[in-house]
């Protein structure tokens, strides 16, 4: 199990912020923190670069997405990161 920090722990019980149409299960019990992919093999960005993500959207981000380009996958993820950062700032989890 990876080391969790306050950002990754804050995903518990949150609404999915990735929200892929036809994929998202909207189940807050399955929400995890989906980090952006890092700069190298098996690397992840810091936890401020992640999104609250339901289990189905997370599987979609990690795998093949028929009908979508990799750039479209990245865009959905980045939009989720922005929405997540706004929530974390609003809730005092991420302080700028």
Model region roles, listed by residue range:
Residues 24-36, 62-67:
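Short Cys/His-rich "knuckle" micro-motifs
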Residues 51:
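Active-site cofactor/substrate anionic-group-binding motifs, chiefly glycine-
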